[in-house]
Amino acid sequence: MKIGILGMLILAGIGFYSCDDITKGYLETDEAGYVTDTLRIAADPGSRDTIPYQSEKIQGVIGTFPIHYELAALRDDSGREVEAVIASQVEVVLTGVFRIAKDHTIPVGTYRADLRVWNLGRSFVLPWISTIVVEPAAETAASGSREEG
């Protein structure tokens, strides 16, 4: 009985020791993505609702914390980067969540977002990781889009 307990303690000690071997700055983004990769929002400047539009969090990013996220680029249908005044309205928060205020002035259209992910030792840009579709308010309501907050 004592040998069994001693053996379990030794195995537990080895297990805890091996956890210390994680390389600081480890970052893997090969499987990164969003389950729903399209965020549909309304172009409705008259909306009284102040809850921002939000995407879900990114999945498949593995690494040592802290892991940071920022918008690397926002591109229009033709692949050109949009003006800074438009891109500045797309914020990336916490775990890679895209957030756009209800009172945004982003023109109607389809946009592709590149996301920069980095930590202490590594940095990756994930091109075209998400799509943002800005529709006239009536079309967004008719398509059944969800406004997440």
Where do the protein language model's features map onto the residues?
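C-terminal motif of bacterial Sec signal peptides marking the signal peptidase cleavage site
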Residues: G15-S18
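Sec-dependent signal peptide recognition
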Residues: K2-L9
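Non-catalytic macromolecular-recognition regions in eukaryotic signaling proteins
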Residues: D20-G149
